[in-house]
Swiss-Prot record:
Coiled-coil stretches: none
Superkingdom as given in the UniProt entry: Eukaryota
Family the UniProt entry places it in: Belongs to the hssA/B family.
Regions crossing the membrane: none
Signal sequence, start to end: none
Stated name of the protein: HssA/B-like protein 56
UniProt-listed GO biological process terms: sorocarp development
Length: 87
């Protein structure tokens, strides 16, 4: 995680690749490590928008969430790659 955070903090917006990780029967996605990486890449404590997409077997999935240090975030659908936009 330290290495990933260091790499993703080099430029903004940040591209973070991650294997598909689903929870709750695939209805939602565990965004823990990506969220931490995005949080660190944005300098910590900042708000950011987090968007992701995944294509496989002819199906396209999209994911978008807004995060703030005070309200947290919600997640849905399975994704494979994502981009952080610091604000």
């Amino acid at each position: 995680m330290t290495i990933l955070s260091a790499i993703t903090s080099i430029s903004r917006p940040n591209k973070i690749s991650k294997s598909v990780i689903s929870s709750n029967g695939g209805a939602s996605l565990s965004m823990g490590s990506n969220s931490v990486s995005c949080f660190n890449a944005c300098g910590g404590g900042s708000s950011y928008s987090y968007s992701s997409s995944y294509s496989g077997s002819g199906l396209d999935y999209s994911y978008k969430a807004n995060y703030s240090s005070s309200t947290g975030y919600n997640s849905s659908v399975v994704i494979a790659s994502s981009t952080c936009h610091c604000s």
